């Protein structure tokens, strides 16, 4: 696998991670385990919620992004130079703009929006 070095990383570089369709059963299964709010777990009760129906947990959509990101990275090994992956420093601005309903397909991507050197770990950057 060819490594991608700090100076090679270009702001604006975008990677398509593919699409994912959220099924009702999967939305309910995820939410029952991790985010059991009524509008995620009960289609009938969800009709009375502010969303007017069942929606996926935002954490479900984030988990799907992570799954697709790792799958795309694995599929790219040996064919595309990759950035070294490490522990995430967290998120500053994660928002869920629109509800994700059963049957919806979302397309996911990642984009390099900036770069930051780490003084404490000169071999790494964000």
Where do the protein language model's features map onto the residues?
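Hot-dog-fold acyl-thioester-processing enzymes
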Residues: 1-89
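Hydrophobic beta-sheet segments that form the core/acyl-binding groove
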Residues: 87, 91-126
């Amino acid at each position: 696998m060819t490594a991608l070095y700090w100076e090679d990383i270009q702001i604006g570089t975008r990677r398509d991670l593919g699409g994912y369709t959220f099924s009702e059963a999967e939305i309910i299964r995820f939410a029952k385990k991790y985010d059991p709010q009524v509008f995620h777990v009960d289609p009938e009760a969800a009709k009375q919620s502010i969303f007017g129906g069942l929606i996926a947990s935002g954490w479900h959509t984030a988990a799907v992004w992570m799954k697709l990101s790792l799958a795309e990275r694995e599929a790219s090994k040996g064919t595309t130079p990759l950035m070294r992956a490490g522990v995430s420093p967290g998120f500053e601005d994660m928002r869920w703009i629109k509800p994700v309903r059963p049957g919806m397909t979302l397309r996911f991507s990642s984009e390099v929006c900036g770069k930051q050197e780490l003084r404490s770990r000169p071999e790494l950057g964000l």
